Amino acid sequence: MTSQDSLTSIGAARIAVTALLDGGVRHVVVAPGSRSAPMAYALAEAEAAGRVRLHVRIDERDAGFTALGLALSTEAPVAVVTTSGTAVGNLLPAVMEANHSAVPVVVISADRPEELHGTGANQTTIQLDLFGDHVRFAVDVPAGDHPQKAVATALYAATGALEDTPPGPVQVNLAFRDPLVPADGDALPAAAGHGVFHYDAGPQALNLPAASGELAERRTVVLAGHDAGPVAEAFARAHGLPLLAEPSSNARFGRNAVGPYRVLLAHFGPDSPTPIERVVLFGRATLSRPVASLLARESVVSAIYQPVPVAWYEEGRRRETPIETLPELADFAGRGSAEWLDSWLLAGAAAQHGLDGVLAGEDLANGPSVGATVWEHSRGQLVLGSSNGIRDVDLAGQPHPEPIATVYANRGLAGIDGTIATATGIALGSGRETTVLLGDVTFLHDAGGLLLGHGEPVPDLRIVVLNDSGGAIFSLLEHGAVEDSGAYGTAVERLFGTPHSVGIGALAAAYGVGHQTVSTTAELAAALKSPLKGRTIVEVRVDRSGLRALHARIKEAVSAAVGQVLTAG
């Protein structure tokens, strides 16, 4: 392209915006910056015309996670626009999560023109391939070049249209020369109102034909990991098999679902009268060591249902046999006998009874009781933060008869960063009431996610913070035993517990977000049932000093209750 043919920066930006919209983008998150100004102006024009919804964030890390949440709830590509320099690097955590979760986040990174690189020019660095293998596609568009093909190809890759490639993040690095503002005489078009950019599928259940009586009877369990979907529940029901479903599987419901399954696995171990023979895995199981141990048992044959490529799986790296079709999976799984399913359901009911009995004896709220209460009262959309929150729900949340909420979690890399921003994006993308459960450390890590500028869309978002003044999860791992031994003094508490005394109420007030404090599950249940408009924080103050002992009592009570049932059977 000759200099006479080169596009102005605003002209190139308008073409890029048109290509984004043509590719299905309806939400764009914009972080302020001068080099990205052409994109900002072009997007403002598109928003005024009612063609796109913009979300402005001053923190690029939160911009990235907001885009991630929007893409999760709308099931469509979402773009995030930044200026040059470190602004682009702040997107890395969200891009990493999007990669491992196969979420189509489109990074539009503005850049200095080629002649400024290597000169020491301000905010100028190598931005192409900054995200390495975490993006499906990355391309440089030099200043003045036509960006349509680059943007279209990026969207093609982001949405999983490339052969044998799952959806995921992409990067389009657009260089812009001065002038970075519209030409004299340009102006926003007359406001045409906003289009409807919400996507609301809601929780779903599926039906599959009952398993053929010719299938062999096998002691198979259906394990539904993250993002398994309702097909896992339908398969378990059709084959008469126990369903062991993580909360973010969106399959933790129905008559075959077993609640506290992870504390039951030892009762159906290799030395039991009725050991598990086979496992059918839907989605990705990430939450507990008992499940990891089950999948590693030499005596257990396992398969993973994988109809399309997934981002986290490399062939030959796992023990499970990948199976692409449900008929093949049916042949592998067989069907469960009535005795096999009943033994699991009876054991599950006994375990739930034992667990509930321990929790009922506690005067104040604790992690498992908060998880159970949030799960019981979930509706609309539920976002579960990493660390203990999602595991508390997995342990104590009793499966519902039918799906009542769509559940999300950042389980791609299971980091605690960006959880508030992700939940905000999820709520804005659907327009539905959303509750997020997270710990105080996760909350503080993304406190900036509470910041919404004047005039920005405000979601209906309830933020439940389990505040135990630090990181309780480490006390349930090997580090808890090290602390109990006293061999390292206070080092374990300092390095892993990370105690603090932040006033969450004061922090909420600073951001203009409502706040209330509760200390019992009854108070929490009342807060969860209250009508929700806008954003509010429900802080549940708990003491983590006795958490390790509480889990020991739960394990003992469950073991006794289940032992009685299985012995009687």
From Swiss-Prot:
Its EC number is 2.2.1.9. One of its GO terms (molecular function) is thiamine pyrophosphate binding. It is an enzyme of class 2 (transferase). The keyword Metal-binding applies. GO terms for biological process: menaquinone biosynthetic process. Its cofactor is Mg(2+); Mn(2+); thiamine diphosphate. Binds 1 thiamine pyrophosphate per subunit. It holds the Pfam family TPP_enzyme_N. Signal peptide: none annotated. Pathway: Quinol/quinone metabolism; 1,4-dihydroxy-2-naphthoate biosynthesis; 1,4-dihydroxy-2-naphthoate from chorismate: step 2/7; Quinol/quinone metabolism; menaquinone biosynthesis. InterPro entries: MenaQ_synth_MenD, THDP-binding, Thiamin_PyroP_enz_TPP-bd_dom, TPP_enzyme_TPP-bd. The keyword Magnesium applies. Keywords: Magnesium, Manganese, Menaquinone biosynthesis, Metal-binding, Thiamine pyrophosphate, Transferase. It catalyses: isochorismate + 2-oxoglutarate + H(+) = 5-enolpyruvoyl-6-hydroxy-2-succinyl-cyclohex-3-ene-1-carboxylate + CO2. Homodimer. PANTHER family: 2-SUCCINYL-5-ENOLPYRUVYL-6-HYDROXY-3-CYCLOHEXENE-1-CARBOXYLATE SYNTHASE, PROTEIN PHYLLO, CHLOROPLASTIC. Catalyzes the thiamine diphosphate-dependent decarboxylation of 2-oxoglutarate and the subsequent addition of the resulting succinic semialdehyde-thiamine pyrophosphate anion to isochorismate to yield 2-succinyl-5-enolpyruvyl-6-hydroxy-3-cyclohexene-1-carboxylate (SEPHCHC). NCBIfam families: menD. This is 2-succinyl-5-enolpyruvyl-6-hydroxy-3-cyclohexene-1-carboxylate synthase. The gene is menD.
